[in-house]
Design a protein with these regions (language model features):
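Glycine-rich, acidic and aromatic/proline-enriched surface loops and short helix-turn segments
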Residues: 73-81
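Short N-proximal segments of mature Sec-exported proteins
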Residues: 54-57, 74
Length: 135
């Protein structure tokens, strides 16, 4: 816009766009120094690359098919997809902060997210740290 970059509210809560260009940094240097960098949708650090999730009500790429119980488990235990066997949530998701919320508070957040406009957006999968990859 005329005042510089503006948020696109049509994409609110839909996570990191799959077609977004990657941040141009030396991942090896970032990881070896324990540094992190972000554009607020993609985070690069010692854990690799993590992307913001689609938490809209979209039933295929968001949380539209989740139950309140899955949502609560995700934020209480830090498990992706709200499944006990799911992978751990990655930085920068501050799930321990949400873990202290009551069931009623988490259900209220979930109810709000269920009411959002469904936005179909396939978020990229997280990437392992380059220092952990076999050469």
């Amino acid at each position: 816009g005329p005042n510089g970059p503006e948020d696109n509210m049509d994409l609110e809560l839909s996570g990191s766009p799959s077609q977004m260009p990657e941040i141009s940094v030396s991942r090896k240097e970032m990881e070896s120094k324990g540094l992190a960098v972000s554009n607020m949708l993609e985070w690069i650090g010692p854990w690799g690359i993590s992307y913001t999730a689609n938490i809209t009500s979209d039933s295929t790429t968001g949380i539209g098919n989740w139950t309140a119980e899955q949502f609560i488990l995700c934020l209480r235990k830090g498990k992706y997809g709200g499944a006990p066997e799911g992978r751990n949530l990655l930085p920068p998701m501050p799930w321990p902060n949400f873990a202290q919320m009551t069931d009623d508070e988490l259900k209220a957040v979930f109810a709000y997210l269920e009411s959002t406009k469904p936005i179909h957006n396939i978020v990229p999968q997280p990437q392992l740290p380059v220092l952990a990859m076999k050469k």
